[in-house]
Amino acid sequence: MDNLWTSLPLPGLSDDQRHWLFAPGSLTLRLKALGRFSLEVTQQRIDFPEPGEAHALGCTTDSPAWIREVALKIDDQVMVCARSLTPMRERRPAWPELAGYGGEPLGSMLYNTPDIHRGAFECQRPQADDPLSRLATSLGQPSGKLLARRSRFLRDGQPLLIAECFVEGFWALLQERSAPLKLAI
């Protein structure tokens, strides 16, 4: 349900939550600072986007899209689940190199290529019927306290939508790992 996405901070967010939902640059680099980072591709397929995703991509729900779902882990624990989509063009993804990324984070390409432009962040609390909530649940994460962000990247007019969902355990880890830093200041 696309109407749940907003470019404004959600009510009741902590300073940490607001920061992580709207921080520019590579999420992967920030996660690596918290511990041993790994990425697990859970699915990579051609499928149809959900209505809100299709709207953000500027296509219809019956237009095939290349979809990649991953779990971003710190110390082998799922902290973020992510879903990337790009429309198919003439039986190829609009961003063809993405199909070969395997277990590599997309950030190395997205932030090192000058002709790629990122749009504004949107955030939401995913509901049970949201693809991010379903992905989190499939990874064994409780779906009740999820926070997500998404943004659209453009290259040569071709969109790539990336949605990232922070699971409940992420915020606990962040508190645990940042507490010594706060005490030292």
UniProtKB/Swiss-Prot annotation:
Keywords: Cytoplasm, Lyase, Pyruvate, Ubiquinone biosynthesis. One of its GO terms (molecular function) is chorismate lyase activity. Pfam families: Chor_lyase (PF04345). Its main location: cytoplasm. InterPro entries: Chorismate--pyruvate_lyase, Chorismate_lyase_/UTRA_dom_sf. It is found in: Cytoplasm. GO terms for biological process: pyruvate biosynthetic process; ubiquinone biosynthetic process. Pathway: Cofactor biosynthesis; ubiquinone biosynthesis. Substrate binds at residues 68, 106, 164. Its EC number is 4.1.3.40. It is an enzyme of class 4 (lyase). One of its GO terms (cellular component) is cytosol. It catalyses: chorismate = 4-hydroxybenzoate + pyruvate. It comes from the Bacteria. Removes the pyruvyl group from chorismate, with concomitant aromatization of the ring, to provide 4-hydroxybenzoate (4HB) for the ubiquinone pathway. Belongs to the UbiC family. PANTHER family: CHORISMATE PYRUVATE-LYASE. This is Probable chorismate pyruvate-lyase 1. The lineage of its organism: Bacteria, Pseudomonadati, Pseudomonadota, Gammaproteobacteria, Pseudomonadales.
